Amino acid sequence: MSLLSDLINLNLSDTTEKVIAEYIWIGGSGLDLRSKARTLPGPVKNPSELPKWNYDGSSTGQAPGQDSEVIIYPQAIFKDPFRRGNNILVICDAYTPAGEPIPTNKRHNAAKIFSNPDVVAEEPWYGIEQEYTLLQKEVNWPVGWPVGGFPGPQGPYYCGVGADKAFGRDIVDAHYKACVYAGINISGINGEVMPGQWEFQVGPAVGISAGDELWVARYILERITEVAGVVLSFDPKPIKGDWNGAGAHTNYSTKTMRNDGGYEEIKSAIQKLGKRHKEHIAAYGEGNERRLTGRHETADINTFLWGVANRGASIRVGRDTEKAGKGYFEDRRPASNMDPYVVTSMIADTTILWKP
């Protein structure tokens, strides 16, 4: 190993109780992630033990230069798979010095919804299928694709194996293990229909933790692709033409849905979602109209449709759920670049709190 590698992998706990905390927050675009580190005197297990911090919001598009300070509040802690030991990753949300959430802080409102007693009683579970595309850095073109050209048509790549079908698996597996190490409820990975595109799943996670875990999983993936020299894209339709887009299908259930007779509650919830289709679409990610065309396993963006085992529907119910008379459903509308705080809390709000 090189000296640099040796130093990167130093085990601090051999010589000190001090730990490094990497504070993570969402930047001005609402999708970009930012982070910086600080030294703490000793191990920490609860976010309430961590100090608030600040950053220059004028450099992230979140504050004017003459009043640039943005305050970040620690909200959840994960083990750091990069520094390891007692070092931690800290997901934060952002506020003005007066304590008001800034516009890109979608966690604040989500936390309000998830703390509502009616929502708490239903214990909403989420499983989010995060699709993404790996791009060659210099040409902004999917890995495994000839520069300026195209691979063979879709068909052999979904869950494919082999040097001519799976591109970037080392990144995918590194991310998988890093998420398990961090304490994220990552439940699986698979190659997607378009070559160079992959998916990981986070969940089941309850309430606000689904958003926290997905954002940290995205951060870890961004860090790994940084090391690999590959660009990570959450564009919902990275390549025009006869290629699948990238989504973030969101699986959802409440306690009532999971109990005997829950299928009736599932159908009732789907009817509510249909009545607020436009509002949900508006909040489900930028550029989603390029993906939701009615082709490539999607429903048309202007049409609300649900069905059993129908991957061309807005909402899909699994055959196992129909057979058992209880379970969960899948909202297939969210784009890969959606904010999980927005999507998860909006589904809970519509299905539990909203009265048509």
Swiss-Prot record:
PROSITE patterns: GLNA_1, GLNA_ATP, GS_BETA_GRASP, GS_CATALYTIC
SMART domains from the UniProt entry: Gln-synt_C
Tissue: Roots.
SS bonds (residue pairs): none
Region span, Disordered: 41-64
Residues passing through the membrane, by range: none
EC number(s) from the headed UniProt entry: 6.3.1.2
Domain called GS beta-grasp: residue spans: 19-99
Subunit structure and binding partners: Homooctamer.
Listed name of the protein: Glutamine synthetase PR-1
Protein's organism: Phaseolus vulgaris (Kidney bean)
Lineage, broadest ranks: Eukaryota, Viridiplantae, Streptophyta, Embryophyta, Tracheophyta
